[in-house]
Amino acid sequence: MKKMILSAVMLVFAASGYAQETGAAGAGERNEWLPTFEAVAVDADLDVKFVRVPDTEAPKIVYDTKGSYTTKFRAEVKDKTLRISEKPDSRRPERTEVTVYYNALRAVSLSGAAATFEGTLDAAVLDVTVNRKASLTAKLDVKDLKKEQTGYSTANLSGSVRYLTLYVSTGKVAASDLEVMSAEVNAQSKAEVSLWITDRFVGKTTTNARISYKGDPKIVRGGAKFMGGEINRVE
């Protein structure tokens, strides 16, 4: 009987200890396990880091709202897409920091967020959308990449891609450290794009956009269209 009572008391202390840890985390960093997802959509002005974990580990999210209780931070997985959102508040002195631990990704969408990938983002096929002054820094190992970038956003890319389809309107794509075998690029509205292309390049610029590329592709098509623009090969 005494053993039963002692066990019950220990369980109560264990439960209250867990509640305290959860409550303490509520004012700072939170850690939540997630169901499996294949895509991420971030629509918030926050800083997010992506870390790949083995398939044997469950994905999770760690976030810190820096003590703000008005952000209404939300992260949920629906239809195999992790959706992250947060209520904007210009009075906040600090941005929310997020770390996403994932197994594999086929699509990434960023709106307003500053995103970095730890290690190499590896995928056979990858779709990336960056808009509303978002930023992306990543090292890639991708066979087929489709990327759309608008809204004065920026991207710094390295690594290797076999096939690239890129649309950029405003903003900047710095990819001179990304080795691309074949690229099709459409740059508009004063966008700036720098690339490294080895075999095939199809490029088009309009409304004062600029594309510069290094490498010696044997197949080159395209040119400047409406309201000019520039396409230049650099050493």
Regions found by a protein language model. Name each.
Residues 1-235:
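Intrinsically disordered, low-complexity terminal regions
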